[in-house]
Amino acid sequence: SEKYLNTDEPTRADLTTASLQKYKNMIDMWGGWKLFQELLEVLNRIAEKHDCSIANIATKFILDKPQVAGVIIGARLGITDHIEDNGKVFDLKIEQDDILLISAVTAKANDLFDVIGDCGDEYR
């Protein structure tokens, strides 16, 4: 999200919850903080072009894949800040040049299915 765009890599002390530690571990296995920043920069440029959020672009990019039937959007009880923003996904059309930009970055990353296996395998 925009929260992490152009930020320094967090230290262990910055990762104050188990969830943050897990997310950072996934980033490290995927390709590291530098590549994550590169992806966020590309997503941000595309988001600015479409007047939406980085999360909208990332969500739509995944939803448009033929093998994907849905995404689970994280939410916290009582926090409604992102409801309206998340709805933008349904009207968003990502252009082919946008897809190529995102794919150019993700092609540099490790395939997490090869690294850790299926969803939840990181806990086994």
Per-region residue spans from a language model:
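Hydrophobic, secondary-structure "cap" segments at the distal end of domains
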Residues: 1, 38, 60-61
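Terminal-tail/helix-coil boundary detector
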Residues: 8-45, 49, 64-70, 82-124
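Glycine/threonine-rich phosphate-binding loop and adjacent beta-strand/alpha-helix elements that clamp
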Residues: 57
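Short acidic/histidine-rich active-site segments
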Residues: 4, 72-75
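Short, solvent-exposed beta-strand-terminating loops
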Residues: 1-8
